[in-house]
Amino acid sequence: MRRTPPTETVPSERASWARGFEHPIAFWSGALCCTAGVLLHLPMYYSARDMGYHLKGMAPDPAMIIGMVLIGIGLVAALYGVLPGDRAGLRRSVTRVRVQALDDAPIRRQHVALLAVMAVAVTIDVMKPTSLGFVVPGFAKEYGLKAPGNPHGHPAAAWLPLVGISGTVLGSLVWGSFADWAGRRASIMYAGLLFVTTSICGAMPGFQWNLLMCLMMGIAAGGMLPITFALMAETIPARHRGGLMVLIGGEIALAYVITSWLAAKLVPHYSWRILWLIGIPTGVLLLVLNHWIPESPRYLIARGRRAEAEAIMARYGAREVQGPDTPEAGTVPARAGYATLLRRPFLGPTGAITVLGLGVGLVTYGFQLWVPTNLQRIGYSAVNSAYVVRNAALIGLPLTVLMAWLYDRFGGRRSIAVSSAATAAAMAGFVIGGDSLAHHRMVLSLLLIVPLSAVSSVVAMVAAYASELYPTRIRARGTGLAAGMTKAGGVLILAVVVSEPNVPGIRTTALIGAIPLVIAAVCFLVTGPETRRRGLEDITRDLGGVGLELDPVAAAE
């Protein structure tokens, strides 16, 4: 029998957000345990400073073992802190609630603050997978792995990015589902804590331990994009929504600039491991910034915390709606899972998003990930290759603004097709030039601008488009699927790299990325509906989702 929640008074902004999740003491106690456990890994890393910070073959010291135990305890306690009680009842309640940003509401200072925090969150999040390209050369050298500089090593260095990117695919799907019923803010908080704990990958002495921690790091990183985009779709007014979300998602390019700069400055002095250890302060920063991220109003209403929800909706110009995305009163809907995305009326758009996501993944992890390695193979030093990548990404940052304007002005469908075609054209330049581009540094840098920057904006466009396209109850899942597919292409190409004797050259990786992008652009033009400046329920209505009744079997998670 469900208990009727007591009547609430409207809380202050600070009091409302301080509450955050169900068991704050458990969460923050767990966070302290995790942080202490991570810090206990640093003495072993520092002790290897006279050996170039090489830890291969070293046995974990007592401090590291104690740290691992503390991290395990802390993660369990923190998970208990964010999990709501009566989860089955909450799942039923949350599907009845619909929250929509007012289409004509002005951008307020709360929106600006939220967008700023989301930009930082996305940047920190994307720094994880983008670090892989700069970690692999040093990682391969320390462990004697098969790589362009050591073709006779074993096993393949590509195992590290393969495991990490596989983790991001899994994370996108898991976190998308989790955030749809447990709340956006709680999900972001726990993902941020995982950012801190998985940074111990930089202190792991064993090859297998590195792979395990990289997998966990990928799972944590894979969830941030679908959560943040779902939250922005619910709080940003329709007339500003698309362009702003693409602009924030374009911080992927900024993350590449920051990561390449850090690699050039720090790796020569502190080894490749420092790129993972940077996750400690950046993860803590993300936890601190979450004070300015509101909880999902629909989650608060489902928990009986209506006063808090109404206060948040008033600040962000949102409302609770009864519309085509809402089941009729008194109807208990079936559980909406990922299978729902593969049924009419979402099958066509989901197919287009999937094909485009796979193409983007092949570019990002078939070409972009191996740029530092391939530049070193054709004669660049590790430092020079990092600077070349950084400069190209830095010059390409204005492309993010251009892509956001295109999305806002012409809509998602056409801008995604144009940006995909432009990226494919730049990749064709690498197919034609090949290794000879090593002698033409200016041409090389110019060609790198588009795949390093434009493809990041395409990822943002896909996530923004998915967050607008799918109804509220499957929004984070839909965005999670889109984000996961942009990584799934990477899993495919990395699996090929692991099985091949050598990492593919720059010409091969460019060709692998260019072909599916062209196919994806055409597919998207044919099947993708337009979402430009439209209310979320209007998009659902035109898709044919009005009164959609989900089959309990097909829609089961």
What do the PLM-derived regions correspond to, one by one?
Residues 203-213, 268-271, 432-446:
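Helix-loop junctions at membrane interfaces in 12-TM secondary transporters
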Residues 54-61, 135-169:
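Extracellular/periplasmic helix-loop-helix junction of adjacent transmembrane segments
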Residues 39-45, 113-147, 364-372:
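Extracytoplasmic
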Residues 170-207:
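Conserved MFS/SLC helix-loop-helix module at the cytosolic interface between two early adjacent transmembrane helices
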Residues 193-206, 422-437:
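C-terminal ends and interior cores of transmembrane alpha-helices
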Residues 1-14, 46-50, 67-104, 292-346, ...:
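Intracellular cytosolic loops and amphipathic helices of Major Facilitator Superfamily
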Residues 240-270, 282-283, 483-493:
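Glycine-rich segments within core transmembrane alpha-helices of 12-TM secondary carriers
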Residues 130-137, 342-400:
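Extracytoplasmic gate region of multi-pass secondary transporters
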